[in-house]
Amino acid sequence: MDQRKTALIFKAFCDENRVRILNLLRGGEKCACRLLEELSISQPTLSHHMKILCDSGIVVGRKEGKWMHYRISSEGVQIAKEYLSGLTIAQTYDEDKPCCE
């Protein structure tokens, strides 16, 4: 996986407000107006966090009238899961070879 893309994905999880947004989106698609009501943050702050989440691929948005609607992207989540899963795969090392040669 591209390291830049991986960094964007995990940056999305590194803020309390973004984690709160993701928890709200677990229940399905939500309008930005609903997110604003539930989070008690300003519209510019929400836009900032949604840009990071959308740029990461974890969240996708669609415009309906004057409002944006957001949902969790199953594709983006799958990429994050595969990366994390890859970190836990046991590495094999040649035990006969010293580690610092």
Regions found by a protein language model. Give the residues of each.
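Amphipathic alpha-helical dimerization/coiled-coil segments
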Residues: 1-5, 75-101
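Residue-level detector of secondary-structure transition/capping positions
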Residues: 29-30, 54, 85-88
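N-terminal helix-turn-helix DNA-binding core of bacterial DNA-binding proteins
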Residues: 4-45, 64, 68-76
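Short alpha-helical linear motifs
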Residues: 45-49, 87-89
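Alpha-helical residues within the helix-turn-helix
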Residues: 37, 48, 54-55
